[in-house]
Design a protein with these regions (language model features):
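Vicinal oxygen chelate
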Residues: 1-9, 29-123, 133-137
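Short Gly/charged-rich anion-binding patches and loops
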Residues: 17-18, 94
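Conserved active-site tyrosine of GNAT-family acetyltransferases
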Residues: 18-23, 99, 127
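Short acidic-aromatic low-complexity motifs
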Residues: 12-16
């Protein structure tokens, strides 16, 4: 069987702020930014991985979700309690400096981890935790 990841969804509360962060801080491409039926379909991704998209999705975009669940997702996002994404880079220091220069919320400065990587962590404008990892060795 040949199966590959095509896209993943990341909850954001402001498409424009999220686009600025991922485009300007991480150098991602904006692949789609289309409005339709009162929604906005936005996909981004690293230029080195053209076959994988990250869909920036508002909290509870599913029209069938209850108002209380929509509010709960919004609260979890605001508190930074939803899982984010992990990215790898060959130059963590340069990537960290670029992200820090945008004023991103720094959670962890670059540090060596006991399992063989060097990592930092930041929050995107929506509060998602983003880890950036460089293999050591």
């Amino acid at each position: 069987m040949d199966i590959k990841l095509r896209n993943c969804f990341l909850i954001v509360d402001d498409h424009d702020k999220a686009l600025a962060f991922y485009r300007d801080a991480l150098g991602f491409e904006v692949r789609n930014d289309v409005s339709y039926a009162g929604m906005r379909w936005v996909t981004i991704g690293p230029p080195s991985q053209p076959d994988i998209d990250i869909v920036l999705e508002p909290p509870a975009a599913d029209p069938g979700i209850s108002a209380s669940d929509r509010a709960l997702l919004g609260d979890l996002l605001a508190k930074g309690l939803l899982r984010g994404l992990h990215f790898s880079t060959p130059d963590l220091e340069d990537t960290f400096d670029r992200v820090q220069a945008t004023g991103a919320d720094i959670v962890q400065e670059p540090m060596d981890m006991p399992y063989g990587t060097r990592e930092c962590a930041v929050r995107d404008p929506a509060g998602n935790l983003i880890r950036i990892i460089q293999a050591r060795g």
